[in-house]
């Protein structure tokens, strides 16, 4: 069983880079915007920075959170949230990613919120993905590929995945219990294969399996902002070798 990733935040040596990325991104927010809030450690810093602007500048916005954790944090820092069931166009979505390849294709879902994160990205007029340099990979698959799977018939879905060559583990909480997403589903973390040269093909193949809700591949129009250890930030908008 794979364990749900733990939050390290300030113990991460790249924490200052994440904060800098968040501050750069929060400057994009303008009055009246609807802002999509991602999940994960870098998105957390963005939410904190946005909450600070709401408090100190009396910035009038609305926001939609991609996870229960992000929702609770947004509420705690005073960011007004809109009804996610009424979600339509989102002016700006800010999120992170687990891996990014040279074509800006990504893997998301390390925090277990991949389905909602992808809905936000689909709705975003402008999508900004914040990552540090460790997330840049030549080919996707360095870590694992999260797949969200409905509980009903999940063992059958796993059998089909294995038959097609996708092997992994069901994600667990730190208490050793099956991890459950905000949508009430499970996460199967695929370890093998460990590289995806053509993730579009794998995504199509996987989404044809009944019971799979979504796959961690993100192939969408987005800007990727990369923070480096030397303090620099590089903004990528299209195919661009590292």
From Swiss-Prot:
It catalyses: aldehydo-D-ribose 5-phosphate = D-ribulose 5-phosphate. Its EC number is 5.3.1.6. It is an enzyme of class 5 (isomerase). It holds the Pfam family Rib_5-P_isom_A. Substrate binds at residues 39-42, 95-98, 108-111, 135. It comes from the Bacteria. Signal peptide: none annotated. SUPFAM superfamilies: D-ribose-5-phosphate isomerase (RpiA), lid domain (SSF75445), NagB/RpiA/CoA transferase-like (SSF100950). InterPro entries: NagB/RpiA_transferase-like, Ribose-5P_isomerase, Ribose5P_isomerase_typA_subgr, Ribose5P_isomerase_type_A. One of its GO terms (biological process) is pentose-phosphate shunt, non-oxidative branch. One of its GO terms (molecular function) is ribose-5-phosphate isomerase activity. Pathway: Carbohydrate degradation; pentose phosphate pathway; D-ribose 5-phosphate from D-ribulose 5-phosphate (non-oxidative stage): step 1/1. The active site is at 117 (proton acceptor). Homodimer. Belongs to the ribose 5-phosphate isomerase family. This is Ribose-5-phosphate isomerase A. It comes from Chlamydia trachomatis serovar D (strain ATCC VR-885 / DSM 19411 / UW-3/Cx).
């Amino acid at each position: 069983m794979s364990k749900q990733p733990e939050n390290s935040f300030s113990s991460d040596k790249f924490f200052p880079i994440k904060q800098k990325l968040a501050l750069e991104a929060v400057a994009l927010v303008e009055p009246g915007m609807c802002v999509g809030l991602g999940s994960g450690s870098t998105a957390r810093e963005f939410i904190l920075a946005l909450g600070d602007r709401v408090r100190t500048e009396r910035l009038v916005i609305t926001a939609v959170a991609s996870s229960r954790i992000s929702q609770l944090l947004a509420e705690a820092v005073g960011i007004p949230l809109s009804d996610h069931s009424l979600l339509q166009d989102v002016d700006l979505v800010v999120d992170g990613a687990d891996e990014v390849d040279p074509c800006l294709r990504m893997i998301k879902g390390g925090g277990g919120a991949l389905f909602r994160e992808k809905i936000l990205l689909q709705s975003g007029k402008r999508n900004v993905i914040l990552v540090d340099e460790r997330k840049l990979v030549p080919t996707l698959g360095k870590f694992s590929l999260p797949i969200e799977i409905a509980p009903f018939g999940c063992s059958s879905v796993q059998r089909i995945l294995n038959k097609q060559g996708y092997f992994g583990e069901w994600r667990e909480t730190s208490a050793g219990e099956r991890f459950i997403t905000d949508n009430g589903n499970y996460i199967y973390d695929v370890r093998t294969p460990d590289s995806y040269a053509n993730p579009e093909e794998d995504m199509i193949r996987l989404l044809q399996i009944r019971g799979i809700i979504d796959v961690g591949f993100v192939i969408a129009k987005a800007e990727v902002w990369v923070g480096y250890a030397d303090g620099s930030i590089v903004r990528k908008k299209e195919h661009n070798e590292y």
